[in-house]
């Protein structure tokens, strides 16, 4: 479709009207360029897909919404906007689209959040009830759906009242009533525990109401994980050919895709035996009480028992083999080099893939048959079986995918990382098997790039080391396929608005020197606090261990520090804003996650402290396997993995400072390697152009090291 004169005029008119809605609106050349580039791509005038880096201040959200809505209307398609996290998803849904509705009054939009963000009205009814008899219909859930105390029951009753009177849409983020994670776990549900159309509350369920709204909406705000799942199952979203897709925070897409395709399952032999026994009893109950018209051959008891016995024997053999690779009687992990399994293990995985797929098919057949049963049956008993069969289906579906992935030598032209872990839970050791592909470009090509005609991938940071090459390698987007890559200029004058400060540290921030380095950092930080030049400050660390050591050096300043983990992030930011607005000094302290999505302007944040260059951890099975694979191709893992990732992290961290034309301040980076190592210049060259200063560091007093036991963390 060509960009007609009428379409261009519509886009221009909306853009002009938008300027009147936003106080102190500043027209910016990069924003106009982005609107034009997005329009040309979505209309099919230029290229297949567009990856466009839009630095802070460009106004990227409105720059893709305006042309996206115009072209979606012209082509009678749905515009799907996908983000990486709920916070940005909600911002677009609750702020940006309502703003556009002021200039496009008939605009219809909705949001597609994950099932776990919505309340389950069935569970809410049970938890809000004061009469045990009212919960009888919910007894089939096999879950504890009773309030822990009277206060919790009253809170649930208030939530139910708000839901029933349409004061609340059922989204966790859209109520002011405090809901802790434990309560929300019981209030919400997942796919395996949802009765879907069989549920009494189906028509009024917030999750399904939102899903039905998608059919009528012109704009749907989703998230990357949901989009990936929808493209895989051809559900929720419109047909790929009938939608336009914008992937905001697009730099997260490869990781989200990899997470979605990672498979893990418990394979502890006694536990597995129990699951198989429960399934055979479940099938027997279905055959006895809700016999299907056509009997599946595998449902015949003798055949099913033999099938499950073979499956168990293979699992038991796999347990014995995997345990030989790990020290006995303790938590442990074993990774298979280059993802290559011994022949014996590979043969077991291939057979397990077939056997679990057959059980998945059997569970699906029974589930479909149960869902079609009429009201002449005992509804409570029927629903209990539906839930149990749904959970069995979920288990065998995951197992089937796991063993299929384990049977593959490669995925997207790269090895599949495969490893086993032994973990202790409630005094018992459990064995798990894990698989994940190093590259997901083939899957992204199949699900997105080849299926949807035109896609916009955007973010404030898409490049690392001034190059799109890492994004291209990880995502599968490529110029020879007609994809375009554009980096817009920043609208800010960084050279005048701020500077980079690299203190003359005596040591590098290595593990061996960490204590002395932290002591020097704390001394310089204390000097900055005492100067009282800055009200709002941010301190970012590469690890929780380093952050805690730093806090040990500044205990006397603790009241001014708002530390990640003390409270939810949004509350820390709210408190920080209030303090600075009242003329008080306030310091946010956190890890890399604090470097993304934090938007504090002017005095709210005028000094950013960065502990060190944040190279990615090199001890995860995925990173180690990727390193082995790169070396086998005569590629240098540091250049391909570590340096681009560190550059990306540093760009994001530095990007917290200048958020508007009125912002000013300093970025303090406590890492001399930026000036002493060859790669340091490349990292600095990828940052906005700031003047650089190198002040002296006051003497730091190194505290005596205390032996601390590092907490074990699950690695991927």
From Swiss-Prot:
Domain of life of the source: Bacteria
Domain Helicase C-terminal: 517-698
Residues spanned by motif DEAH box: 131-134, 248-251
Residues given in the record as ATP binding sites: 54-61
InterPro entries tied to this protein: ATP-dep_Helicase_C, DEAD/DEAH_box_helicase_dom, DinG/Rad3-like, DinG_proteobact, Helic_SF1/SF2_ATP-bd_DinG/Rad3, Helicase-like_DEXD_c2, Helicase_ATP-bd, P-loop_NTPase
Enzyme Commission number(s) from the entry: 5.6.2.3
SUPFAM superfamilies named among the record's database cross-references: P-loop containing nucleoside triphosphate hydrolases (SSF52540)
SMART domains: DEXDc, DEXDc2, HELICc2
Binding-site positions, [4Fe-4S] cluster: 120, 194, 199, 205
Catalytic activity: Couples ATP hydrolysis with the unwinding of duplex DNA at the replication fork by translocating in the 5'-3' direction. This creates two antiparallel DNA single strands (ssDNA). The leading ssDNA polymer is the template for DNA polymerase III holoenzyme which synthesizes a continuous strand; ATP + H2O = ADP + phosphate + H(+)
Keywords from the named record: 4Fe-4S, ATP-binding, DNA-binding, Helicase, Hydrolase, Iron, Iron-sulfur, Isomerase, Metal-binding, Nucleotide-binding
GO biological process: DNA repair; SOS response
Cofactor(s) recorded in Swiss-Prot or TrEMBL: [4Fe-4S] cluster
Cofactor binding mode and count: Binds 1 [4Fe-4S] cluster.
Annotated Helicase ATP-binding domain residues: 17-294
Gene Ontology molecular function terms on file: 4 iron, 4 sulfur cluster binding; 5'-3' DNA helicase activity; ATP binding; ATP hydrolysis activity; DNA binding; DNA/RNA helicase activity; metal ion binding
Enzyme class: isomerase
HAMAP family tied to this protein: DinG_proteobact (MF_02205)
Family statement drawn from the similarity comment of this UniProt entry: Belongs to the helicase family. DinG subfamily. Type 1 sub-subfamily.
General function of this protein: DNA-dependent ATPase and 5'-3' DNA helicase. Unwinds D-loops, R-loops, forked DNA and G-quadruplex DNA.
Name recorded for this polypeptide: ATP-dependent DNA helicase DinG
Organism, as annotated: Escherichia coli O157:H7
């Amino acid at each position: 479709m060509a960009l007609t004169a009428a379409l261009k005029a519509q886009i221009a008119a909306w853009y002009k009207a938008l300027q009147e809605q936003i106080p102190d609106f500043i027209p910016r050349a990069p924003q106009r360029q982005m609107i034009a580039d997005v329009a040309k791509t979505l209309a099919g005038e230029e290229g297949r897909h567009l990856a466009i880096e839009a630095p802070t201040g460009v106004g990227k959200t409105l720059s893709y919404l305006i042309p996206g809505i115009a072209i979606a209307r012209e082509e009678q398609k749905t515009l799907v906007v996908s983000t990486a996290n709920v916070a940005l998803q909600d911002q677009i849904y609750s702020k940006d689209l309502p703003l556009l509705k002021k200039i496009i009054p008939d605009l219809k939009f909705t949001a597609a959040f994950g099932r776990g963000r919505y309340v389950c009205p069935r569970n809410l009814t049970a938890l809000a009830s004061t009469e045990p008899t009212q919960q009888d219909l919910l007894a089939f859930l096999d879950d504890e759906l009773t309030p822990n105390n009277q206060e919790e029951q009253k809170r649930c009753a208030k939530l139910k009242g708000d839901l029933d009177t349409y004061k609340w849409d059922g989204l966790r983020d859209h109520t002011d009533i405090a809901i802790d994670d434990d309560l929300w776990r019981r209030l919400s549900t997942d796919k395996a525990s949802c009765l879907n159309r069989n549920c009494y509350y189906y028509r009024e369920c917030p999750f399904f109401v939102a899903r039905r709204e998608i059919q009528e909406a012109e704009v749907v705000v989703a998230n990357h994980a949901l989009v990936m799942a929808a493209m895989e199952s051809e559900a929720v979203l419109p047909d790929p050919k009938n939608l336009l897709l914008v992937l905001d925070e697009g730099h997260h897409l490869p990781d989200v895709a990899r997470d979605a395709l990672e498979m893990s399952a418990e394979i502890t032999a006694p536990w597995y035996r129990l699951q198989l026994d429960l399934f055979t009893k479940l099938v027997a109950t279905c055959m006895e009480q809700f016999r299907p018209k056509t009997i599946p051959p595998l449902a015949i008891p003798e055949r099913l028992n033999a099938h499950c016995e073979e499956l168990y024997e293979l699992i038991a053999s796999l347990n014995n083999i995997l345990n030989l690779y790990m020290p006995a009687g303790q938590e442990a992990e074993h990774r298979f080099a280059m993802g290559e399994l011994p022949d014996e293990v590979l043969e077991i995985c291939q057979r397990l893939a077939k056997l679990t797929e057959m059980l998945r098919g059997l569970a699906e057949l029974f589930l479909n048959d149960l869902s079609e049963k009429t009201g002449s049956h005992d509804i409570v008993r029927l629903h209990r079986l539906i839930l149990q069969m749904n959970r069995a289906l979920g288990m065998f579906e995951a197992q089937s995918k796991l063993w299929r992935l384990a049977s593959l030598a490669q995925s997207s032209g790269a090895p599949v990382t495969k490893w086993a872990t032994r973990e202790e839970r409630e005094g018992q050791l459990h064995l798990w098997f894990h698989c994940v592909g190093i590259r997901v470009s083939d899957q992204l090509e199949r699900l997105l790039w080849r299926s949807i005609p035109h896609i916009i991938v955007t973010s404030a940071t898409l490049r690392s080391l001034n190059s799109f090459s890492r994004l291209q390698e990880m995502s599968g987007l490529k110029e020879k396929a007609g994809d375009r890559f554009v980096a817009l200029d920043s609208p800010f004058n960084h050279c005048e608005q701020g500077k980079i400060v690299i203190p003359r540290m005596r040591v590098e921030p290595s593990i061996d020197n960490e204590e002395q380095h932290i002591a020097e950092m704390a001394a310089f930080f204390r000097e900055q606090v005492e100067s009282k030049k800055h009200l709002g400050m941010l301190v970012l660390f590469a690890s929780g261990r380093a952050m805690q050591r730093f806090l040990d050096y500044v205990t006397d300043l603790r009241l001014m520090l708002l530390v990640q983990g003390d409270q939810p992030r949004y509350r820390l930011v709210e408190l920080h804003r209030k303090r600075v607005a009242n003329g008080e000094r306030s310091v946010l302290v956190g890890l890399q996650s604090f470097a993304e999505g934090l938007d504090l302007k002017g005095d709210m944040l005028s000094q950013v402290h960065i502990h060190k260059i944040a190279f990615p951890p090199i001890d995860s099975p995925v990173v180690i396997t990727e390193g082995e694979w790169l070396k086998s191709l005569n590629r240098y893992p540091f250049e391909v993995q570590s340096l681009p990732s560190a550059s990306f992290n540093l760009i994001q961290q530095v990007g917290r400072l200048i958020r508007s034309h009125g912002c000013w301040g300093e970025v303090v980076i406590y890492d001399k390697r930026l000036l002493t190592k060859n790669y340091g210049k490349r990292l600095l060259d990828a940052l906005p152009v700031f003047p650089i200063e190198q002040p002296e560091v006051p003497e730091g007093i190194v505290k005596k090291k205390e032996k601390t036991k590092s907490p074990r963390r699950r690695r991927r």
